[in-house]
């Protein structure tokens, strides 16, 4: 059995062509392709702050506002941004993702999981730890921990349904839009190509 080495020269050529074509796009389109993942990250950060606020109210946590808000904004921003960048934007830019449905689906999944559900799930231990530290809410005994957090989380998940769906639809739309912009860029003529 032969071991196949990836053809880096072919991949480099494809990447070079795609990057040249993207540079020909108008600045607003280029910015959407380059910084689209940051929009997903910002929405995830807002979702994290909303989830943090809801859990703080339920658990009556009044201390350490900055200590809980900072990680609830920064961590979801970074994870959603990097996830979208590595699963949607980068494969699009390198030519590894060439299907609009695949791009839209990947964008929606990143928006749902990393932009919607992850910030809510991250808020549970952050605010649970603060509630235990400041004794602001009676916490359960060892046997009831799972049921307690399900009961506490249900109203938060209900209230976060709309922001999570909004994040999913936005990420799906952004994936579709980025795909269409890339197709538009690839259809542009080469400015310095000489025809003999």
From Swiss-Prot:
The lineage of its organism: Eukaryota, Metazoa, Chordata, Craniata, Vertebrata. It is found in: Mitochondrion inner membrane. Its main location: mitochondrion. The gene is Tmem126a. In the retina, significant levels of expression are detected in the ganglion cell layer, the optic nerve head, the outer plexiform layer, and in the outer ellipsoide length of photoreceptor inner segments. GO terms for biological process: mitochondrial protein quality control; mitochondrial respiratory chain complex I assembly; optic nerve development; protein insertion into mitochondrial inner membrane from matrix; toll-like receptor 4 signaling pathway. It comes from the Eukaryota. Belongs to the TMEM126 family. This is Transmembrane protein 126A. Signal peptide: none annotated. Interacts with OXA1L; promoting cotranslational quality control in mitochondria. Residues 56-57, 128-159 are mitochondrial intermembrane. InterPro entries: TMEM126. Protein required for the cotranslational protein quality control in the inner membrane of the mitochondria. Associates with newly synthesized polypeptides and may act as a chaperone that cooperates with OXA1L for the insertion of newly synthesized mitochondrial proteins into the inner membrane. Required for the assembly of the ND4 module of mitochondrial complex I. It is a multi-pass membrane protein. It comes from Mus musculus. Keywords: Membrane, Mitochondrion, Mitochondrion inner membrane, Transmembrane, Transmembrane helix. The chain crosses the membrane at residues 35-55, 58-78, 107-127, 160-176. One of its GO terms (cellular component) is mitochondrial inner membrane. Residues 1-34, 79-106, 177-196 are mitochondrial matrix.
């Amino acid at each position: 059995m032969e071991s196949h080495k990836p053809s880096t020269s072919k991949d480099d050529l494809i990447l070079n062509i795609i990057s040249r074509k993207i540079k020909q796009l108008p600045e607003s389109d280029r910015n959407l392709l380059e910084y689209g993942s940051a929009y997903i990250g910002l929405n995830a950060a807002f979702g994290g702050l909303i989830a943090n606020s809801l859990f703080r109210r339920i658990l009556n946590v009044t201390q350490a506002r900055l200590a809980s808000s900072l990680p609830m904004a920064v961590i979801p921003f970074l994870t959603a941004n990097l996830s979208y960048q590595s699963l949607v934007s980068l494969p699009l830019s390198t030519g590894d993702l060439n299907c609009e449905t695949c791009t839209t689906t990947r964008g929606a999944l990143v928006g749902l999981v990393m932009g919607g559900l992850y910030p809510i799930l991250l808020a549970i231990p952050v605010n649970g730890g603060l509630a235990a530290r400041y004794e602001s809410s009676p916490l359960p005994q060892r046997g009831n921990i799972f049921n307690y957090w399900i009961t506490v989380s249900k109203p938060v998940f209900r209230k976060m349904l709309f922001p999570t769906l909004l994040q999913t639809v936005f990420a799906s739309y952004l994936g579709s839009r980025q795909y269409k912009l890339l197709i538009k860029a690839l259809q542009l003529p080469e400015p310095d190509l000489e025809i003999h």
